[in-house]
Every structure is written in C-alpha cells, then in structure tokens.
C-alpha cells in the first residue's frame, strides 16, 4: 500500500534576504552554460547569519520500502528519501536549510534531488511551486510539482510516483512549450549522494 499526505514540518533555516527591488539585467555573464539572464525573476543577494525554526508544507510518499519527503516551497525538490529496510537515507538528507548565493537568482541549497530547467540551476529553484497528489488505478500514488516559468513562458512538471511492492521512486519530467515559437532548454536532476 502507498500513502501520500501533506504535513507541517519544522526545519532549521537560514532565511534569505529581500529581493532587489529593481530588476537586474545581466547579459553575457556566462554562468555554467547559461547566459546568466534571469529577468523578470528578482535577484536575492543576502542570507541571514541566524538560524530559525521554520515551518514548511512537506508532502510525503511512503510504501513498505521507502519514505520520501518533497518540499514544494523550495522548488519542489525531493528533500529526503529513506530506505526503511536498510534504515538509512539513500540520498543526502540535509536537515538544515542553509542557502548559498550560487544560484542564478541567488539562493541555492544542497541535499536531496533538485530539478533544473530551462537552464542552469533553475532560476526558481528556491521558489514555491504548485503541487497535487494523484492516486492511480494500479494503487500507486504520484505527487506532481509544477510551475509556469517566467523567462521563456514554459511549463515544467516533475511527477514522483511510488508503487506498492517496489523499492524505488519513479520520477517523470514533463515540459510544455506554451509559446508559438520553438524554445531551447536543458533538463536535468541533481541528486546529492
């Protein structure tokens, strides 16, 4: 049997500063394969030095073998994946949210599995995404996270499916070009192991 649910989760967090109030037009700042352009996303250039306990809406998937936690408020990343048989995490579980200013728009965190598109470490990697739980006819459950990306007006989704009797998490990426012109993109996931 597979269960999915939403639960409040308190995680020690170093909060981010306020976004720059004026847009930053970065051009020709080649940054790990991207142009560096992030407009219209706001850029954040500061992180607090003090840790606070912050409450997040965490979404969980669980069967007899594994338990997974997804944080839609932090870009829809898989924050935790736990092997219940071996009693250990099978991806790095960073139990403190401490951003570094290395992302295209500033904040980026290590750990879990991060999903990136249309370029680099997704400009919105530290921003909230939409979330939905889908119960499938075969007894599996899928948690979908999605967003309408602002730079190129594409829609990106990641579906996390857990099946009864299986000891793996199935991840499906879906991208939609919502424009009338062809768009280029990169798509990849960064699992921390």
Label every PLM stretch briefly.
Residues 2-38, 58-62, 66-128:
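Acidic-aromatic substrate-binding/catalytic surfaces of carbohydrate-active enzymes
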Residues 101, 110, 137, 180-181:
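Intrinsically disordered, low-complexity regions enriched in Ser/Pro/Gly/Gln/His and often acidic
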Residues 25-53, 58-62, 110-168:
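Extended, loop-rich substrate-binding clefts of extracytoplasmic carbohydrate-active enzymes
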Residues 48, 62, 68, 72-86, ...:
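Acidic, contiguous internal or C-terminal segments within carbohydrate-active enzymes
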Residues 1-32, 163-172, 176-193:
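An exposed, glycine/acidic-rich loop-and-rim segment of catalytic or binding clefts
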